[in-house]
C-alpha cells in the first residue's frame, strides 16, 4: 500500500516480503541483546545490509533521485503490556521533493497486539508488517498482548526527482511527467517538422522506448490519437513510413544524424532487447490524449532541435523541433 500527501510525496509505504533477504542478517546482529529494550548499533556505510536496503528502496519507491540511509540501526524490543505513548512529530520537510522516513523491519512478530499505529490526515493506519513512514506523522506502538515484538528501525532520507507535471491515469494512479530521462523507460516526442517539399505530415507524436523503437501516437494536427499500433524500429523509419510524401523515399536515400544521436536517448545506452509499451485499455488511450494536449501546450517553450540528413547530392536536411517528456507506465 502506498499513501501520498497533498504535494504528491509518499508518506507511507507498506512492504510484503522484500526484506526477507536481510532479516536473518539483522537478527544475527542483535542475537546477544537480552537485557535492553532499545539499543543502537553503528554499521559501515557500505555494509551488505545497508546496501541491500538501499537497492530495495530504489526498486520499490517511485521517481527517486537519491536514497540516504543512516548507518545506525536501532533495535527495539516490546514485551506484553509495555506502556507505549504516542510519539508526536514536529518535523517539516524543507523542500517539496525531499522527505525523511522511519523504516521499520520486523524481526519478531507478536502473536497478538503490538501493531504500529500511524496518525494520518486521511485516517489512522495500523500495521504489523515492514513499513516506512514519513517523520511528519505521529505514531504509536500498540501494546503487545501475547508474544514479543522486536523491530529494527532505520532513518531514511529520500530526494525525489522534480516532475514537470502529473497526468491523471485512473482513479488510483497519476503519472509523473519529466524532462529528465534518468530512471525513465519511455519518452513521448511531440515533433514539428520545418516546411519541406518532401514532407506530408508536419506535426507528429511518437513514444520512443529504450531500444529506440517508436510507437506512432498522433499525426493529425498533433492531437488525433492513432488507434492502430504502428511501431517502427527507429525514428528514421517513422520518417520514411509516415512523414514523407512518397513511398519511394527508402529507395532514393537513407537518413543519418551527424552527431549519431537518437531522437530521445543517449545512443550508447540503447537496449536493443527492450519491447515497446503499447496502449491496450481505455485508461491508456485517455492518458495519451492528455499527454499529447499537455505536450502541445508546452511545445513553444520546451523544445530542442533534431536534425536528420538524407544522403542525396546535395544532402537533404530535415530539421525537427522536438518537445520531449519522459515517464514510466504503471506496472
Swiss-Prot record:
Domain of life: Viruses
InterPro entries: Poxvirus_C4/C10
Pfam families given in the database record: Pox_C4_C10
The family this protein is said to belong to: Belongs to the poxviridae C4/C10 protein family.
Name of the protein: Protein C10
